[in-house]
Amino acid sequence: MMGPKANAAAAGDLPEYAEVDPTGRYGRYNDVLGKGASKTVYRAFDEYQGMEVAWNQVKLHDFLQSPEDLERLYCEIHLLKTLKHRNIMKFYTSWVDVSRRNINFITEMFTSGTLRQYRQKHMRVNIWAVKHWCRQILSGLLYLHSHDPPIIHRDLKCDNIFVNGNQGEVKIGDLGLAAILRKSHAVHCVGTPEFMAPEVYEEEYNELVDIYSFGMCVLEMVTFEYPYSECTHPVQIYKKVISGTKPEALYKVKDPMVRQFVEKCLATASRRLSARELLKDPFLQVDDLVFCPGDGDYSLMNYLRQPYLEHAYSNVSMMSNGLSESIDEDTPTEDRWDCEDDDIKADGIDLFNGHEDEPLGNVDITIKGRKSEDGSIFLRLRIADNDGHVRNIYFPFDIEADTALSVATEMVAELDITDHEVTRIAEMIDGEVSALVPDWRPGPGIEESQDTTYCHNCGSNVSSCGSLYAYMSSAARGCQCAELHGRFEEITFQANGEQTDLQDSGGSSDDGGGQTQHVKDQEAVHSNGFVQMGRRGPPDQFCFSSFQEQSCSPRHYEYDTSLQAKGFDMKHEVKMAKYKARKMAHLRRAIHPSLDFDNLNGERRMKSSLNKLQSFHIGKNHNFRIPTCERSPGARDAEEDPDIFNLAYHSRHPDPGAQRARHCEVDAQSSPDLMFTARSYYTGAQLPTNLPRTKSVTLNAVDA
């Protein structure tokens, strides 16, 4: 047992604060992080948040003889208080210490110092990392320049850009020389000569001077040389800048794209691009580059970056007829993205997913879970953006076999999720599971042992349909982890917007003519292995329809007689399809007993005028057409033709273009009245992991 003396001795071993703020929250150590002409930055500690911060201290006597400097300091503090951006240094608080005649303000601390120090420390940096830094700096500048009136930094350089190396993020700081452009032009000549634009010397400039300084920062990042280092006096720099002579370091840049980008930043003010325009420059469009893993590289990063796909391709498999059994380089494949090894070695691999000019804060990610009586856990991940697009992803979680990181990685691999970090989703899963199971211990999601092998059939870089197609293909039948595929059910809807049109681009009616139908009371939602039919109702009410609601009593079948000669048993295949549909309906009814299917059928029978033929695709070879529901007897016309079921036989490897034509295209702007939601979803039993799944399902609306 430790006595008071022992406690005092232990406390004496701890480093003592050199200074404490008036509230007692922040304590300053004597460790100096940086020192300038009039400001010293110390290491400090936030006792409330339990994190290290930067204690900026300025001596007041340094400004007593210079009111302009004092005003500039107050300007910096005021700006830091009002600016809130992920690429601008965070400001916490400030105060004046009258007794010590100091002005103190607390900002976030950067673990890796300035960008110049960080770049000199890490000499071997791929050009894609430089692009990533450039996008972040431009994003911060765009935020400053978008104010009304605009805010210009006026002293942007690598010494005023700070880095958190463990996250690869850079932020703009040291806004002491920043000015609010209250008029059309600023009228002061301030800054660092090597980074000052020619118009600054003429004291007639606008926010584009920051773009000129940014170009010099890029030049320093790629050459490790300070701009105009060949000059020995500021006057020499002034003469070169005024005459339009570029620094010699620019001509040492061998990459033509880098050099061209820097020249755009250093152009004359009338031709210089803005931060918004530079963010759209092809040089910085790293997200449009194709990601191709190297030889045998199947690490976690393969999931973090997926190629960008057009909206029309988001719900369709991109696998071609030459689906390979592996992704080894020596195996010829037609579905793999084309990448040359020389390009990979020269440009590296893009590990930075998401658009840097679109803050992740605009995307709201929440998770909710439920634990059943038998101990099984079912989770819902909700992803919503500012445009009202909502994605609900439902999946079971096995606390004995699953880890949060492995489930998150599998989710990114199967679903079209490219804008969210795997680690962030994994942390949310860990937190929710820990709340449901107090004894749960988070662990790593990937076993980093030599015996652990990566399943080549799991790594689909295309879309959720692509992963499902690969799973159901012959190449994946022997896959050891194939039972994990299809665990996710995704429901998407629009929180607000215009009316949604459902188009059938590939189906044909009974008369053979392909027509486009606008479905106003139902919406088809694609997911991995299931079909959900949307009905009229508010977005906060959810329901799942079953295949039993689909009438499966065909009057007669039409098919090619040549199939019989090939040994194709049509009756057997139809019976199997009907059995699978009924089986799926029973499972749905058992899993979600709280759903009022009778009431739902009643609502659909009331809409007899909208009795459409639906099409669902089971497997790779057969396409059946079934009616959505049976009309009430009073609603049928005497002259109406009987429902016809058309059956078409497809080849073993269907054309991806034909598959895309059969998918319904949903307009991006959806009506709230047409939203598909899930009512009382968590009141049902948990979804078993061994639930039978169809291979792929599509819904098309055609004329009845």
From Swiss-Prot:
Residues 499-519 are annotated as: Disordered. SUPFAM superfamilies: Protein kinase-like (PK-like) (SSF56112). Residues 27-284 form the Protein kinase domain. It holds the Pfam family Pkinase. It is an enzyme of class 2 (transferase). PROSITE patterns: PROTEIN_KINASE_DOM, PROTEIN_KINASE_ST. It catalyses: L-seryl-[protein] + ATP = O-phospho-L-seryl-[protein] + ADP + H(+); L-threonyl-[protein] + ATP = O-phospho-L-threonyl-[protein] + ADP + H(+). The active site is at D174. ATP binds at T107, E108, M109, F110, K157. Induction: By fungal elicitor. The keyword Cytoplasm does not apply. It comes from the Eukaryota. GO terms for molecular function: ATP binding; protein serine kinase activity; protein serine/threonine kinase activity. Keywords: ATP-binding, Kinase, Nucleotide-binding, Serine/threonine-protein kinase, Transferase. Its EC number is 2.7.11.1. Belongs to the protein kinase superfamily. Ser/Thr protein kinase family. WNK subfamily. PANTHER family: SERINE/THREONINE-PROTEIN KINASE WNK WITH NO LYSINE -RELATED. This is Probable serine/threonine-protein kinase WNK1. It comes from Oryza sativa subsp. indica (Rice). The gene is WNK1.
